[in-house]
C-alpha cells in the first residue's frame, strides 16, 4: 500500500492531502487534514454514458458523522439520518465550484462523497471538503484538467483574513467563499454586514490570489498518484442538422424572440419546434435518421446563438429592455388580513408572496450539528410550486436542494439587518411563496422578506433589496445584464446575485460558466447591481421604508420583564403551582430564567396585560410607610401574620390591633385588614400596625 502526501500552508494553518490509505476501490480517494479535522473525499466515475442521458449527472454528497465530534446522535435510532440543510448547502457549494471545469457534452455519471471523520470545532470543514473533492477528481481519471480550489476569507478592522477560524468569523464583517482555477473565478458565496462594493471586490480578488498554492499541491499529488484517463466521448450538436433548421426556420425563431411575454413566446416557440420536427422527420435531410433529442438540441443551439448575438450587437433583450433596465416593479404590503405581516413583490413576470409569522422562544428552531444544538430565532423558507412556471408537478413534498439554497441566500441577505434578541424578543419565520417565476425569484424573495418583516413590525435595521446580474461574453466583447430573465440565466455565462441595503452589500452569490472573467467585468457588474439595487429600494421605500411601530392586531404580544433573580422562585411557586395558575387564568405563555428575565407571550394584549399585572404583584417589594390591604394567613398567641404582596408577609402584634380599637378574639384566617408597614429589619422581617377605621 503506497501512500502519497502533499502538505501546504493556508492562512497560517497546515493542510495535508493524502491518498492511497483509505477507500482504495474508489477512482479517487483523498483525506484532507487540518489540525484535528479529517475529511475523506471519494470520487467514482462511470466508464460509459447511460442510455438516454442528455446532461452531466454529477452528484455531490457532503456528510457529517457525529462521532467526528465525539457525540452520539439524537433521536430514537441514535444514528445519522438524512443530511441537514447545512450539509445540503455545502454539497451545493462543492457542486457549483467543480461543475464548470468539465467539458461541454461530457455525460458520464460522477459521484463525489465527502465525509467528515474528525472535527475539532476550530475550523469549518466545508473548505477542506471542497479541496478534497477537487483533489480526488484530479487523481480519478476523469476529464478534469482545470483543477479547482476554494478558500474562505474574513474581513475585520479593514483587513482580510485568509482561512479564518470560527472565532475569527464571529468577529468578522464578511464571510466569503471563492472557488476557481488558476486563472478564473468560478463561484462566489458570501454574507456581509453592508460592506461597500470595493471591499467585496477586493475580497474576491484576494481570495483568488491564494488559490494557486492549493492548485499547485493538487497538481503535484495528481502527477504521482493519478489513474489513467478514462475513455469518454463528447456529445456535440450536429452542425449540418443545425444549418438545415436555421435555413428553414430562423426567421420564425427570430420573430418569436421579439415577443416580450414569456407565455406567448413559449407558445410560439413550441409551435415552431413542432414544425421543425415534422420537417426533419418527413424529409431526407442528409440521408441520416435523427432523434427528437438531437433535433431539439440543435434548435436550442440556434436559440442560444440568436439571443446572445442580439445582446452583443446592442439590440434589445428578449423583453425589449436595454442591458441596464430593471423590469417594472409593483409592491404591496398587508395583502393577507389574517397573518402577522405580508408583502406581494412583483418584478416583471416574477412574483413572490412573502409572509412573516411571529412566535415565542418555544417556536425557535433547534439545529443539531457537530458543534451541538443551536437555537435559531430567524427562519426563512422558500417554496417553488410548479404552477409558478405554468407546469404540472409534485406538490407538498420536502424542499428540494434548489429551494433550500434559495432560502439560505435570502436569509443571509437579510440576516445582517435582523435585530438581536435583546432588541426584539420574538422568534420570526418568513415564508416566500413563488407565485410566478421568470428569473431572479430568490432576489424577489429578498425584497419581499424585507417588506413583509417591516409590515409585521420587525425592527430591521435597513430595508434590503436584491438583483440578479447576467453576462454574455464572446471573446473580447461582453455585455453585463441587469435583472436577468430565466432565459438569459439559462443561455448566458454568469448568474451573479447581489443583495444589500442603501449602504452596501449583505450577500453575494455568483456562478460563472466560462473562463476569463476580468476585474473590469466584476467591477461593472457590482456597480450596475448597486444602481439597480438603489432603484428597487426607492420603489420599496415609497410603500414602506421603516418597520411599523406596533405589531398586527392578530399578532401575539410579548413582554420582557427583568426582576430580582431571588423572586423567580416566587413567580414559579412550589412545584410550578404559581406560574401554572397564571397561565391557566390568562392563557399566556411564561418563560423564566435564573438571571431574573421573565418573558410573557400572549395571544392578545388583554391576556398579556393580565399576566404581567399578576407577576408584578408577586414580585413587588414591600416599602416602609406604605399602606396595604392584606389577608390574615396565620394566627399566633401574640399576633397575626398578614400576607401583603405575593409571598411577602408581615407581623401584626395584638397590641397594635387593640390600640386601634379592634378585638383580637374576633380575628380569623382569611380576614382582610388594612395595615401600615412600620419598618423592615435587616433580615427582611416586616412589622405592621393596623390602620384605624
Swiss-Prot record:
Q: Does the keyword Acyltransferase apply?
A: no
EC numbers: 2.7.7.8
Domain KH: start-end pairs = 556-615
- State its location(s): Cytoplasm
Top-rank EC class of the record's enzyme: transferase
Mind listing the UniProt keywords for this protein, alphabetically?
Cytoplasm, Magnesium, Metal-binding, Nucleotidyltransferase, RNA-binding, Transferase
Cofactor(s) for this protein?
A: Mg(2+)
Q: Name one Pfam family in it.
A: RNase_PH_C
An example Gene Ontology molecular-function term: RNA binding
Q: Name one GO cellular component term.
A: cytosol
Extract the signal peptide range. none
Q: Which InterPro entries match?
A: ExoRNase_PH_dom1, ExoRNase_PH_dom2, ExoRNase_PH_dom2_sf, KH_dom, KH_dom_type_1, KH_dom_type_1_sf, NA-bd_OB-fold, PNPase
| Entries under SMART domains matching the protein | KH, S1
Question: Which GO annotations describe the biological process of this protein?
Answer: mRNA catabolic process; RNA processing
Q: Which positions in this protein are listed as binding Mg(2+)?
A: 489, 495
What is its quaternary makeup? Component of the RNA degradosome, which is a multiprotein complex involved in RNA processing and mRNA degradation.
Q: What does this protein do?
A: Involved in mRNA degradation. Catalyzes the phosphorolysis of single-stranded polyribonucleotides processively in the 3'- to 5'-direction.
Protein name (database record): Polyribonucleotide nucleotidyltransferase
Q: What is the lineage of its organism?
A: Bacteria, Pseudomonadati, Pseudomonadota, Gammaproteobacteria, Thiotrichales
Amino acid at each position: 500500500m503506497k501512500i502519497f502526501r502533499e502538505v501546504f500552508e493556508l492562512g497560517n494553518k497546515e493542510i495535508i492531502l493524502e491518498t492511497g490509505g483509505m477507500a482504495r476501490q474508489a477512482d479517487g480517494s483523498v483525506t484532507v487534514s487540518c489540525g484535528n479535522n479529517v475529511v475523506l473525499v471519494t470520487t467514482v466515475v462511470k466508464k460509459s454514458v447511460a442510455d438516454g442521458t442528455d446532461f452531466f449527472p454529477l452528484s455531490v454528497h457532503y456528510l457529517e458523522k457525529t462521532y467526528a465530534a465525539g457525540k452520539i446522535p439524537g433521536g430514537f435510532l441514535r444514528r445519522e439520518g438524512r443530511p441537514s440543510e447545512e450539509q445540503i448547502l455545502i454539497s451545493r457549494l462543492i457542486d457549483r465550484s467543480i461543475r464548470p471545469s468539465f467539458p461541454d457534452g461530457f455525460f458520464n455519471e460522477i459521484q463525489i462523497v465527502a465525509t467528515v471523520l474528525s472535527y475539532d470545532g476550530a475550523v469549518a470543514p466545508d473548505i477542506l471538503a471542497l479541496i478534497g473533492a477537487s483533489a480526488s477528481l484530479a487523481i480519478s481519471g476523469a476529464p478534469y484538467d482545470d483543477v479547482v480550489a476554494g478558500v474562505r476569507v474574513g474581513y475585520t478592522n479593514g483587513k482580510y483574513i485568509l482561512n479564518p477560524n470560527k472565532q475569527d468569523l464571529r468577529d468578522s464583517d464578511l464571510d466569503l467563499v471563492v472557488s476557481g482555477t488558476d486563472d478564473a473565478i468560478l463561484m462566489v458565496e458570501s454574507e456581509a454586514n453592508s460592506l461597500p462594493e470595493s471591499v467585496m471586490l477586493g475580497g474576491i480578488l484576494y481570495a483568488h490570489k491564494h488559490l494557486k498554492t492549493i492548485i499547485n499541491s493538487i497538481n503535484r499529488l495528481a502527477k504521482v498518484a493519478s489513474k489513467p484517463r478514462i475513455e469518454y466521448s463528447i456529445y456535440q450538436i450536429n452542425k449540418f442538422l443545425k444549418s438545415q433548421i436555421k435555413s428553414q426556420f430562423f426567421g420564425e425563431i427570430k420573430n418569436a424572440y421579439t415577443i416580450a411575454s414569456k407565455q406567448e413566446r413559449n407558445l410560439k416557440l413550441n409551435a415552431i419546434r413542432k414544425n421543425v420536427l415534422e420537417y426533419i422527420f418527413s424529409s431526407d435531410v442528409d440521408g441520416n435518421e435523427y432523434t427528437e433529442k438531437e433535433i431539439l438540441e440543435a434548435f436550442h443551439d440556434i436559440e442560444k446563438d440568436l439571443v446572445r448575438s442580439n445582446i452583443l450587437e446592442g439590440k434589445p433583450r428578449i423583453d425589449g429592455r436595454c442591458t441596464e433596465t430593471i423590469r417594472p416593479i409593483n409592491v404591496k404590503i398587508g395583502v393577507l388580513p389574517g397573518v402577522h405581516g405580508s408583502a406581494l413583490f412583483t418584478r416583471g413576470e416574477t412574483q413572490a408572496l412573502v409572509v412573516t409569522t411571529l412566535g415565542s422562544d418555544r417556536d425557535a428552531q433547534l439545529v443539531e450539528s457537530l458543534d451541538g444544538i443551536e437555537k435559531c430565532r430567524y427562519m426563512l423558507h422558500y417554496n417553488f410550486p410548479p404552477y409558478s412556471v405554468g407546469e404540472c408537478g409534485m406538490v407538498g413534498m420536502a424542499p428540494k436542494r434548489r429551494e433550500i439554497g434559495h432560502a439560505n441566500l435570502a436569509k443571509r441577505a437579510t440576516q445582517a439587518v435582523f435585530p438581536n434578541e435583546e432588541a426584539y424578543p420574538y422568534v420570526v419565520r418568513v415564508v416566500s411563496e413563488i407565485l410566478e417565476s421568470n428569473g431572479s425569484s430568490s432576489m424577489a424573495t429578498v425584497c419581499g422578506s424585507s417588506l413583509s418583516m417591516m409590515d409585521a413590525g420587525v425592527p430591521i435595521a435597513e430595508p434590503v433589496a436584491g438583483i440578479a446580474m447576467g453576462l454574455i461574453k464572446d471573446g473580447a466583447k461582453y455585455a453585463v445584464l441587469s435583472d436577468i430573465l430565466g432565459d438569459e440565466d439559462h443561455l448566458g455565462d454568469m448568474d451573479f446575485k447581489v443583495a444589500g441595503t442603501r449602504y452596501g452589500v449583505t450577500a453575494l452569490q455568483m456562478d460563472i460558466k466560462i473562463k476569463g472573467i476580468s476585474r473590469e467585468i466584476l467591477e461593472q457588474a457590482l456597480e450596475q447591481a448597486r444602481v439597480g439595487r438603489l432603484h428597487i429600494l426607492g420603489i420599496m421605500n415609497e410603500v414602506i421604508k421603516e418597520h411599523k411601530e406596533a405589531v398586527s392586531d392578530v399578532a401575539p404580544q410579548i413582554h420582557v420583564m427583568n426582576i430580582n433573580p431571588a423572586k423567580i422562585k416566587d413567580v414559579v411557586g412550589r412545584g410550578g403551582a404559581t406560574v401554572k395558575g397564571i397561565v391557566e387564568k390568562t392563557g399566556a405563555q411564561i418563560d423564566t430564567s435564573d438571571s431574573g428575565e421573565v418573558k410573557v407571550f400572549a395571544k392578545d394584549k388583554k391576556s398579556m396585560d393580565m399576566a404581567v399585572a399578576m407577576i408584578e404583584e408577586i414580585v413587588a417589594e414591600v416599602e416602609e410607610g406604605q399602606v396595604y390591604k392584606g389577608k390574615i394567613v396565620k394566627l399566633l398567641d401574640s399576633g397575626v401574620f398578614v400576607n401583603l404582596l405575593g409571598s411577602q408577609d408581615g407581623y401584626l402584634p395584638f397590641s397594635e390591633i387593640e390600640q386601634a380599637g379592634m378585638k383580637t378574639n374576633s380575628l380569623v384566617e382569611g380576614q382582610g385588614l388594612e395595615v401600615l408597614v412600620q419598618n423592615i429589619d435587616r433580615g427582611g422581617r416586616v412589622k405592621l400596625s393596623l390602620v384605624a377605621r
